């Protein structure tokens, strides 16, 4: 960790160790960080304390260590679209009721690419068949899978458009119950999903593989992977085999293949917080009365992940508005200070006995944010994190 980042961590240490994990980098901290980086002397905690601080931050994100993804790590467009949809960004994809249902029961979405070295299966007449194995060992044991889908890309074929025709294929997805053996070159399989598709458009096809993934993760069954079978219903084999992209073309570069290669997506819940939801801009509940400048209220605070050197593994957002609470809780407590009965009594006692502390200005309402990041295994994860944004402050 570079010296500048350690200076920043030292400035942020009190906020996290004292439980104020809603924000990381206040404007004051930015100025101090700039000064510390330019050589101004400042007291710094020990390396052990800084390491403990970073571990606490990572623990808050459910990580055991800081991810260090390679430059070749790929973020599937599907996951980026999913993030935009659930973060409510302008220009996000149109609503997808199937995805909304899946996300309504999950707070974590994970994506997996298959291991290409295990693709080949014997060809059969009129069919293209591949075995796909996805390593799901990075899914935490406490995460319950609520649904899973296999994404397969199909390309629009110019022959179909030029002839105003529609060549059809049937895509069958099987779970491998028992792998092929020396005595049997074909594995024992169970049909999971099937669909009839044509060549008139380029799009992703989604197949429900929830039963298989739940057996592997929740019931302890062995994961032998899937068989994807494309049945060519027309005779033009040379064209149709290139239509459904279940394997990489001979001269296709790594980047273009990474954008359309098959993808397994799991939706799960770790029992913490609420499911993913589309974040909408909140409206003010009521007009705020004129307050004293020093009274308890919400203040701006922007968290920039690049300031702590985490922008290499956090894909989106680059930062977020966390806000923080600060200000006086004077006697008598006004209605707009959103106080509890206990805070009112405590403030009353403080007015006659200074040994009793005043009520504190703290967050009274918090909301979640969605984060898209690369985990320790370079798997792309979309997760909902609770209590990250201060929505309201009060005296408590």
UniProtKB/Swiss-Prot annotation:
Biased composition (Basic residues): 274-293
Major localisation: secreted
UniProt GO BP: ameloblast differentiation; animal organ morphogenesis; aortic valve development; astrocyte differentiation; atrioventricular canal morphogenesis; atrioventricular valve morphogenesis; BMP signaling pathway; bone development
Sites where a glycan is attached: 135, 163-164, 200, 338
Quaternary structure (record): Homodimer; disulfide-linked. Interacts with SOSTDC1. Interacts with GREM2, RGMA, RGMB and RGMC. Interacts with ASPN. Interacts with MAFP5. Interacts with FBN1 (via N-terminal domain) and FBN2. Interacts with type I receptor BMPR1A. Interacts with type II receptor BMPR2. Interacts with SCUBE3. Interacts with TNFAIP6 (primarily via Link domain); this interaction is inhibited by hyaluronan. Interacts with ERFE. Interacts with BMPR1A/ALK3; the interaction may induce HAMP expression.
Alphabetized PANTHER family for the sequence: BONE MORPHOGENETIC PROTEIN 2, TGF-BETA FAMILY
Name assigned to this protein: Bone morphogenetic protein 2
Organism: Homo sapiens
Biological classification of the source: Eukaryota, Metazoa, Chordata, Craniata, Vertebrata
Name of the coding gene: BMP2
């Amino acid at each position: 960790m570079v010296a500048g980042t350690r200076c920043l961590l030292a400035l942020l240490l009190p906020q996290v160790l004292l439980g104020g994990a809603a924000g990381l980098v206040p404007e004051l901290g930015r100025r101090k960080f700039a000064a510390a980086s330019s050589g101004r002397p400042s007291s710094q905690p020990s390396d052990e304390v800084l390491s403990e601080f970073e571990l606490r931050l990572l623990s808050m994100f459910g990580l055991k260590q800081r991810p260090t993804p390679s430059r070749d790590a790929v973020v599937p467009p599907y996951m980026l679209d999913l993030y935009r949809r659930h973060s409510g960004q302008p220009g996000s994809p149109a609503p997808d009721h199937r995805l909304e249902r899946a996300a309504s029961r999950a707070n974590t979405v994970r994506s997996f690419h298959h291991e290409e070295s295990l693709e080949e299966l014997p060809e059969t007449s009129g069919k293209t068949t591949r075995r796909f194995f996805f390593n799901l060992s990075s899914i935490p044991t406490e995460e319950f899978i609520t649904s899973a889908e296999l994404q397969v890309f199909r390309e629009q074929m110019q022959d179909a458009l030029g002839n105003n025709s529609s060549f059809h294929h049937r895509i069958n997805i099987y779970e491998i119950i028992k792998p092929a053996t020396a005595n049997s070159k074909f594995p024992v399989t169970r049909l999971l999903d099937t669909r009839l598709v044509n060549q008139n458009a380029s799009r992703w096809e989604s197949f429900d593989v929830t039963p298989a993934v739940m057996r592997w993760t929740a019931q302890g069954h062995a994961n032998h992977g899937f068989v994807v079978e494309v049945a060519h219903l027309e005779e033009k084999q040379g064209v149709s085999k290139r239509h459904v992209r279940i394997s990489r073309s001979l001269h296709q570069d790594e980047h273009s293949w990474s954008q359309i290669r098959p993808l397994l997506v799991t939706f799960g819940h770790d029992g913490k917080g609420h499911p993913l939801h589309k974040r909408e801009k909140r409206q003010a509940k009521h007009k705020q009365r004129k307050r004293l400048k020093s009274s308890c209220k919400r203040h701006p605070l922007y968290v920039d992940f690049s300031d702590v050197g985490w922008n290499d593994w956090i894909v989106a957002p680059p930062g977020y508005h966390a806000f923080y609470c600060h200000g006086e809780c004077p006697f008598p407590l006004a209605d707009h200070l959103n106080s509890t009965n206990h805070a009112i009594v405590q403030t009353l006692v403080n007015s006659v006995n200074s040994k009793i502390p005043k009520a504190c200005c703290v967050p009274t309402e918090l909301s979640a944010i969605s984060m898209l990041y690369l985990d320790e295994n370079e798997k792309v994860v979309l997760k909902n994190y609770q209590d990250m944004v201060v929505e309201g402050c009060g005296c408590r």
